[in-house]
């Protein structure tokens, strides 16, 4: 969906655009934050932000209104190398870089995995603020408590959508624990 890898089968659209035919247009309109920290660890916080702004032909100043709340928390560390940041600070930097070009849709792949409880809570507060600014946010998460903060949940297994509903509807449909079982044979 982020068009970083182009699909070789099936069909998908983002904002009504085909993920294969329209991938350049989609890339300009989506932000993506991978599950594993993937920014340049040898660059400083400021250098990472400047780099991503340049890639998207924008500037921090131009879209500061979007990242202000997040950036204000990492600005004291702007001269620190990204690899030396704490887990929570790395996530804030990655989110700022994903937002630097003012995307309409934000894809977050397990954004709080391996982050402490306080940072997780802060991160979800930031997402609520971004949602209030009109950004559509898609989050993959293994944490049901995080999923319940979303407007809608999709259960996906092996690339197939099993169910889509509100958190309340999903819990009503699956009142018992869900388990994923796989075997090697």
Predicted segment positions?
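ABC ATPase "signature
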Residues: 164-165
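Conserved ABC nucleotide-binding domain
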Residues: 61-84
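Hydrophobic anchor residue at the start of the ABC signature
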Residues: 95
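Conserved ABC transporter NBD signature motif
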Residues: 10-18, 26
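Catalytic Walker B motif of ABC-type/P-loop ATPase nucleotide-binding domains
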Residues: 106-109
């Amino acid at each position: 969906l982020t068009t970083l890898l182009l699909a070789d089968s099936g069909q998908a659209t983002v904002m009504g655009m085909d993920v294969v035919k329209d991938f350049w247009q989609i890339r300009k309109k989506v932000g993506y934050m991978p599950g594993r920290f993937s920014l340049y660890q040898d660059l400083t916080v400021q250098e990472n932000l400047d780099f991503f702004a340049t890639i998207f032909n924008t500037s921090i100043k131009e879209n500061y209104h979007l990242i202000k709340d997040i950036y204000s928390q990492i600005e004291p560390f702007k001269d620190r190398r990204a690899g030396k940041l704490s887990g929570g600070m790395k996530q804030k930097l990655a989110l700022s870089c994903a937002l630097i070009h003012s995307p309409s849709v934000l894809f977050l792949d397990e954004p709080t995995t391996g982050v402490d409880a306080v940072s997780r809570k802060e991160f979800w507060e930031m997402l609520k603020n971004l949602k209030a600014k009109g950004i559509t946010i898609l989050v993959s998460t293994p944490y049901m408590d995080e999923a319940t903060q979303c407007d809608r949940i999709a259960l996906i297994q092996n690339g197939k959508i099993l169910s889509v509903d509100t958190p309340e509807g999903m819990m009503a449909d699956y009142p018992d624990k869900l388990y994923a079982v796989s075997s090697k044979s």
